[in-house]
Amino acid sequence: VIHGDLTYGVCGEGFSVIFGYGEGGPVSLVYDGKECLYRAPKPAVWRASTENDKGNGFPVKSAVWMASDMFAACIGCTVKEYAKDKEYPFDVTDIVGRVPAAEDIDRVEITYCFTTRTVPETEIQISYQVNPAGQIHVQLHYKGKQGLPQLPEFGLRMVLPEAVEEYSWEGLCGETYPD
């Protein structure tokens, strides 16, 4: 674990990941020497409209989500380090009082909070848990509010540094899609 002024790094055998405190997520993800990210992942809350959507006016009713998708703003970041199931909170704003990372850290959790560009505003949280094997467990949480229109999509948008030529998708049912 590496504590930086603007970044937080985790590295192990065959991998490294660098989280930007103000970037809203990981800014670098390297496995076996190959960079896997072009930019930090962001919440995805808008999708292309279908013919059915257009027929019932959905794109107009839910247009606020398009702005929220395009202009997602990270408003905070928290870091927790774990060693032998004991939690060690880490203050990302305390540059002066930081102590070096403990050698026995067995996982870290970085959580970013995004605000939506809707009225009323609400929040989306993205948590990344990284273990020593380089596995990253990602969780997204949406805190809905009364009065908001239907949410078109909820997911994580990742921009990769190069086109993917081969992949497999295991969706939950016929209603899910790999984009």
PLM features: residue spans?
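Beta-strand/loop-rich accessory regions of lumenal/periplasmic or secreted enzymes
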Residues: V1-D179
